[in-house]
Structure formats: C-alpha cells, structure tokens
Amino acid sequence: NIYTLKYEGKLKPSSELKLHCQIYKTKPEIGAVIHTHQMFGSIVAAAQVDVQVLDENHQNILGGKVIKAAPYALPNTKKITMATAKAIENSNAALMSNHGVVCIGKDLEHVFDVARTLEKACELFIESKKAIA
C-alpha cells in the first residue's frame, strides 16, 4: 500500500520503498518505477549534474530535454525521497546524486526502455563533455 507502506507476501520490499511510493503518489498515471545503478547514469549522478539529452529520440522516450539530478542526501531518508520525486516531476527519469538513477513508465516494458535510453543519453552526454574538454 503506497500510503501505509504495508505489504503482503514473503518477499521483502526494496529499502527504497518510501521513494518508490512517493513517486507513485506524485505521478499516479505511471505503472512502474525502477531504481538502478547503471554505469553511465551512475557516473553522471556522481558528478551531481543534470543531463542535457542530446538526441531527439532520447528526448521523446525520456520525456524531456533535461534529466535533473536530485541534490545529494543519504539513502533511505525523507530528504532523498522528496528531492528525487521533485527531480522526476517533468520527465521519465532522474539522477540521484552520488547514488544512481530512477526511471518511471506506464509499465515494466516501458520503464526498461526508459532505463536503457537514459544509459545511452548519459553516455552521449559524457562523450560530448570529453569532446569539448
């Protein structure tokens, strides 16, 4: 239950349960949330910068031209939960500074597509920064 944080069954929910529930509350139209530690997404998250999405197809899948980085906060805290929910307000993904990424979608297939696309967008973003350095 996203309001009481109570669950049924034998499997224990993720330690980021509050984060997942807050995103579902904030964006009731979605059907799936995933939190990953994918390589390029985590690199950009460690840099604590927003990702400029350079490819138009990536922009369509990610729901915007910029993927926001939530300010750093300790994992499993209200601060990181609220900061990440705010960072994902206008797109289908957000970076969790020094931690990883969160992606949302209408269903699991869609959210995995968002995660794959975010990884490609982060790789392109890193390459673009290297090219001008």
Where are the predicted features?
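Glycine-rich flexible loops
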Residues: 1-133
